[in-house]
């Protein structure tokens, strides 16, 4: 008995009741005397460090005639010649474009900040003309045209999402595809890239970011000592703001095996006070994949009808936010093309519930899912992804919410908030529709539009 008691006493002395909390990197932002904004998130446990420039101009800053110029700049930065030079220095390159921003990132081992900045400064910022040699430009353009053609022919879900933007934001900046079109890319010349860079790659429209194992003061000192200088100028302002228009675009193709459909209402811009409410509302319905057994057990009411009648192969609800506007809706793919009308009807009837009968349980479940999603995004462990996220948020908001701050905002959302948001954004609101494949069963626009409300008495 004595031995047993002693054993328990000793074991309790060394037993830990809680795991050590992992500190989330905190964003630090500094504006230098030359106008350059520097933002970092230091993660001392990271095995790499990423340094780059994020510009607040993406596809939305293009026009129908130079659409795709950002995509060309991205691929020129990542060209074989430039990547080979970087590899010799022990560096890796990455670039990303969206509708609101584009980034050019150099990754290295910790302690190589100066080397990364030297490469970024010499090969891109100060000597962009070297990247635009005739042979390099034509080779990159040919490669991009092939990529876009492959996207148009094979990536049906994302192609439909691009068409959803084009119809929802007709004749406004957000309507332009991020990759460009075959027609616009074919007509681009070196002068188009030079003009875009001169107007948008400016210190007033940029954030120099550092993520991973790199300290804020080290990056600031390196930038000042290396005389990193971006072209000066006034930050460009979009002449036309995004405006949502209820409309549709259909590309019926009965040779395809399925129907791909996206449907959305106007969503929330990034700086909206209802940004997280919209995100949470999308998580109430979440996503579904008919071929994953666990996906069928989520407790989403919409799945009762979808599984009983096998209405779709998958769906995903989204809340996409941009500077001026956003899209809130869902994308789906289905082989059951004779029951598309039922799929849309049951989905929109569930949307109606957000205004009149969403429950506390559904909201709490959505909070958990949204926090999990944000946690995975904020703590991805990938400095390149962190750099893109940091730069995009600092450009639009001037800072970046910590994970704890984001969680507090999510926890503060109530059922009343969701109902109020849905009453404003969903109930009896115009919709945008895009579809391709076997969409004969996607019936008349006004029939679908009438499902955005219901008789409550």
Swiss-Prot record:
It comes from Saccharomyces cerevisiae (strain ATCC 204508 / S288c). Residues 1-26 form a transit peptide. Belongs to the peptidase M16 family. UQCRC1/QCR1 subfamily. It is found in: Mitochondrion inner membrane. It holds the Pfam family Peptidase_M16. Present with 19300 molecules/cell in log phase SD medium. InterPro entries: Metalloenz_LuxS/M16, MPP/UQCRC_Complex, Pept_M16_N, Peptidase_M16_C. This is Cytochrome b-c1 complex subunit 1, mitochondrial. SUPFAM superfamilies: LuxS/MPP-like metallohydrolase (SSF63411). Component of the ubiquinol-cytochrome c oxidoreductase (cytochrome b-c1 complex, complex III, CIII), a multisubunit enzyme composed of 10 subunits. The complex is composed of 3 respiratory subunits cytochrome b (COB), cytochrome c1 (CYT1) and Rieske protein (RIP1), 2 core protein subunits COR1 and QCR2, and 5 low-molecular weight protein subunits QCR6, QCR7, QCR8, QCR9 and QCR10. Keywords: Electron transport, Membrane, Mitochondrion, Mitochondrion inner membrane, Respiratory chain, Transit peptide, Transport. GO terms for cellular component: mitochondrial inner membrane; mitochondrion; respiratory chain complex III. Component of the ubiquinol-cytochrome c oxidoreductase, a multisubunit transmembrane complex that is part of the mitochondrial electron transport chain which drives oxidative phosphorylation. Coiled coil: none annotated. PANTHER family: CYTOCHROME B-C1 COMPLEX SUBUNIT 1, MITOCHONDRIAL, METALLOPROTEASE. The gene is COR1. GO terms for biological process: aerobic respiration; cellular respiration; mitochondrial electron transport, ubiquinol to cytochrome c; protein processing involved in protein targeting to mitochondrion; proton transmembrane transport.
